[in-house]
């Protein structure tokens, strides 16, 4: 709805960032509301990442008010929250109405779709490294454009983000990092860094004081002694006002936290960062799903939603009697075996619902581990558990397990450890596009020693089996059938409902399998 009943629509007038800049500040709340209305209308029909995008409406407007793409580079981590960016860079109207459909806007950002998409993405943790590379290239070329990395708080659970953070000050003096902190990745964020962000107590008091005193010191003639006094003051006052200064330990100037839905505050802080001669991190607090009651109440469900009723939040495809999804069949079987054997453990990377491990997390939280978006750690963690006679099961999407390939080879298979990988979302991912296709798993796993790779079987073969824990050193093997395709060749299971196969209540023996098991579903 518009802020005023008589106000003409603004969103249809936005053909690019210049039109966003041309609006009066008083018009921006109306634009934000129109964007939210459009997001809800389109995703309720097509599905998509509605929760993350509703949370970054004001932030994205502010970014395009302050910076000028495509000259300035905006790099969005994961890029699933790029819908608002698309609407503000000439991809609205009918093109956006076909979001995630043939001939329409993609669900992520791709350099081939628009010059405003500085870097393509679909996986988490990539923005800071890519932006740092762009900023360094700018410095080497002697150009002056701004580079901004927009990262969710979940990105800081990724090792690659911390690797980039460790290299920022040694690579460039001009980089802006926007930390979009909504306390969620897909599921609730976990780990020490998530706890740290929740505890940060920096207020506008410190930032205003810092700004005023900085101006005071700069009013004096520069000199070694004055610089020493200023540096000492800055360090000691920061320690007083801030519980911890993690980002400043890495050499970044910290600003925040900033209300991510206050356009004036966002623009002010972005403008300040734009003129800093040191790398800056702006800590922005946002509400995932803001503007849609169901998305606020159920942020995990509405992270990436199927078509839904915007009034009730219910899926429009939820048909009574529909067989369970394949991941739910897997999750139920794993929970049953975990109840029987306390050494059976489930591990996932920020996706308990998507991988089917929510039941295990609810019923046996002591046998469930969500390590955040850290697939390399997940696999190594499982390897360590396996050395002590535990039976870890890593449930990770096919496209995301690529990120831990070295750990699969070097740390699990070469040591012949009994780790099970359940690779969900094999095959084409349909609306999510090429960054999420599970096309490479069979190729990169069949060549690995000491691993048994299993896939779904033709309709005529047994629907699925679970291996004996004793004979397989307590490793689960699930094989779920697909519909017959007129061939005896195995076919990997795609995302969606199963064929309603009843689960066997007792395991069967498969003694010839290797300790490391990979289930491709």
Locate predicted features.
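Active-site nucleophile and cofactor-binding loops and adjacent substrate-binding regions
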Residues: 47-56, 75-80, 109-128, 151-155, ...
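Low-acidity, Ser/Thr- and Arg-rich intrinsically disordered low-complexity segments
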Residues: 460-469, 473-474, 481-499, 506-516
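A glycine-rich helix N-cap at a beta->alpha junction
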Residues: 93-108, 170-187, 205-208, 369, ...
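Short acidic, glycine/serine/threonine-rich loops at helix termini
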Residues: 84-90, 156-165, 187-192, 197-198, ...
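Cofactor-binding active-site loop characterized by glycine-rich and histidine/acidic residues
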Residues: 50-171, 326, 343-344, 357-358
């Amino acid at each position: 709805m518009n802020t005023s009943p008589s106000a003409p629509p603004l969103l249809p007038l936005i053909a690019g960032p210049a039109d966003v800049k041309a609006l009066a500040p008083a018009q921006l709340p109306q634009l934000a509301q129109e964007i939210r209305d459009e997001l809800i209308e389109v995703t309720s029909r097509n599905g998509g990442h509605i929760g993350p995008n509703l949370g970054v409406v004001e932030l994205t407007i502010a970014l395009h008010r302050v910076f000028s793409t495509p000259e300035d580079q905006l790099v969005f981590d994961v890029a699933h929250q790029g819908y608002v960016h698309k609407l503000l860079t000439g991809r609205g109207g009918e093109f956006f109405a076909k979001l995630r459909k043939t001939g329409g806007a993609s669900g992520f950002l791709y350099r081939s779709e628009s010059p405003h998409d500085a870097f393509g993405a679909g996986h988490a943790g990539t923005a800071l490294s890519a932006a740092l590379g762009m900023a360094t290239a700018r410095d080497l070329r002697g150009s002056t454009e701004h580079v901004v990395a927009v990262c969710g708080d979940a990105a800081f659970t990724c090792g690659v983000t911390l690797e980039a953070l460790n290299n920022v000050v040694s690579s460039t003096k001009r980089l802006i990092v926007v930390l979009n902190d909504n306390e969620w990745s897909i599921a609730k964020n976990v780990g020490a860094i998530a706890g740290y962000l929740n505890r940060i107590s920096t207020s506008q008091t410190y930032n205003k004081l810092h700004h005023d005193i900085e101006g005071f010191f700069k009013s004096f003639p520069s000199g070694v002694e004055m610089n020493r006094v200023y540096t000492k003051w800055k360090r000691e006052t920061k320690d007083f006002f801030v519980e911890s200064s993690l980002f400043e330990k890495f050499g970044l100037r910290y600003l925040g936290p900033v209300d991510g839905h206050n356009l004036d505050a966002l623009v002010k802080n972005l403008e300040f960062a734009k003129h800093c001669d040191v790398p800056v991190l702006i800590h922005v607090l946002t509400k995932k799903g803001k503007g849609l009651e169901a998305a606020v109440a159920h942020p995990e469900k509405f992270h990436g939603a199927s078509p839904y009723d915007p009034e009730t939040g219910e899926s429009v495809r939820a048909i009574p009697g529909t067989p369970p999804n394949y991941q739910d069949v897997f999750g139920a079987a794993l929970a049953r075996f975990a109840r029987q054997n306390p050494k059976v453990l489930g591990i996932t990377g920020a996706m308990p619902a998507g991988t089917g491990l929510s039941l295990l997390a609810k019923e046996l939280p002591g046998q469930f581990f969500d390590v955040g978006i850290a697939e390399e750690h997940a696999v190594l963690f499982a390897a360590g558990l396996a050395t002590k006679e535990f039976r870890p099961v890593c449930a990770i999407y096919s496209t995301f397990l690529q990120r831990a390939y070295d750990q699969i080879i070097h740390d699990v298979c070469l040591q012949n450890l009994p780790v099970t990988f359940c690779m969900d979302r094999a095959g084409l991912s349909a609306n999510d596009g090429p960054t999420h296709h599970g096309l490479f798993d069979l190729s990169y796993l069949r060549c690995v020693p000491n691993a048994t790779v299993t896939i779904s079987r033709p309709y005529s073969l047994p629907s699925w089996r679970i291996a004996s824990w004793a004979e397989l050193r307590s490793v689960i093997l699930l094989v779920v059938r697909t519909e017959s395709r007129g061939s005896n060749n195995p076919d990997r299971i795609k995302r969606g409902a199963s064929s309603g196969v009843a689960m066997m209540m007792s395991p069967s023996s498969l003694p010839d399998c290797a300790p490391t098991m990979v289930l491709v579903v």
